[in-house]
Amino acid sequence: MTASRILPGTGRGPVLAMQTGLSFWGGVDPDSGRVIDAQHPACGQAMAGRVVLMPNSRGSCSGSGTMLELALNGCAPAALIFAEPEDVATLGALIAALVFGRPVPVLRAGPKAFARLSRCDSIEITEDTIIGHGADPVTLPLTEPAQPEPALSSGDRAILAGEAGPAAALAMQVILRMARLQAASRLIDVTRGHVDGTILANQANLIFAEKLAAMGAQVRIPTTINAISVDRQNWQQQGVPPVFAGQAARLADAYTAMGCRPSFTCAPYQLDDLPKAGEMIAWAESNAVVYANTVLGARTPKHPDYLDLCIALTGRAPLAGVYLDAARRPGCVLQIDAPNAADDALWPLVGHLAGLLSPDAVPLLRGLEGLNPSTDDLRAICAAFGTTSAAPMLHVAGVTPEAHLPPLPDAPHHAVSRDDLARAWQSLNHGPDRVDLVAIGSPHASVRECRRLAALLDGQRVQVPTIVTTGRGVIAALTDGTAEALHKAGVQLLPDLCWCSMTEPVFPPDTTAVMTNSGKYAHYGPGLSGRKLRFGSLRDCAQAALTGRAADLPDWLRADERTA
């Protein structure tokens, strides 16, 4: 049995063992350390002060920010023990130690050691030993993992020596620590970045950004930024508390002061100048990463928050993960029994289920050939997959550009039946039949999606609040009458913020149940908002907006319809 030290530190505490990965952002309350992911078996459990074991993290790149906030708030786990290589929470713990002096030990255990430690009641971590207490006690030596020193260019050494300023030097230190953990042989140039940590999900995001900005940080590559937590132009009319709005604006201003483009969108693939196939980029935001790799054929790992900024400040990234050809090959094959006459709800359903079945490997999806998905369908499958898996991409046979890559020799094969899809639909529909809010735009809605919604409403006025979050560029493109039609129908078009960053009172406070077409928000929404969620197609959402009633299980998933 083996266990190795990834980040140093000592600690002890009762064990919280998970067999399913967890997204720290959207899955853990940063103020208490309680698990809030309603879909996770550990929901309601406290992580603070406990030795937390899990195979890997999953989902959001923003988990690093949550991990840092937990450390700053004094409610972090006593230690983290992973069974597999993990970047997101590890990066948050690295920043907590390196920048703020709040270390959280991170360890990796081999399969047998992980299983044995998971059965312990409590664990103690010393400088060189891990000791598990309980009915089946175990003591293991802690080894140092092989961490080859990456080769540095003269430019890398100059940045590290401070020739580009203290912020870039700190950024290079972080990059090199991660490069060693990822066993990267060298750093590579990247052409563009997308920074994720612009949402005021916690004070750690603001503290980190303002600290780097105060050090004179400036990005070296074109860098867009994610959605923020307020509509910058209209927050006062929306009743947002000035203190919160001011902090959200400060966070956005810190990034723009560092030279980032004020794009304020979680869908950077809807901006102009898309990345090209094979282009080495450095994006964070899980849905954007999965879309860039899967649909565009660009190359970017799922960079954790804060590492994304460090890369933007240097233009350099560790040569690891899906930057490499071998890491893009399928490690899992899913045969989908695609229903006849399925609507657009199929794609987020498949993405959600694919992530659960392939939590840490790039999957190849077969059985969807000939369905001719739209870019909105592909956006939906990528967003849902990026929520339930740690993998940064997937392949769809006959659809995506690298689906021809041969699966790895030991790639497992799974059949996904229509009953599996029906059960996935049920798992995302825990809310009541009556809904009092319709949520569109997670990720940010496209021009096509807004036009479809206007057409589905067909001049009728909504009976429950209906909000579409999207980017400023999309709203500017809706001058063909779509924006006016949605406004007349009573639909709110909100720029800058997104559903994953929306808070009361912009999120209507009296809401009890929400209808959405987003597999991502159907998963995260209960934990983020405290409300029940219903999921369906865009047509289902339009009908819910007009009637206040959520749709039932669609006909194309009903067993009686399939056997008729």
What does each model-identified segment do?
Residues K276-G370, P508, A522-A564:
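Mobile "lid/hinge" segments at catalytic clefts and subdomain interfaces of large enzymes
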Residues P363-N429:
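Acidic, glycine-rich loop-and-beta core segments that form the ion-binding/anion-interacting portion
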Residues G65-L72, N205-L212, V219-I221, L346-A354, ...:
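Histidine-anchored nucleotide/phosphate-binding helix
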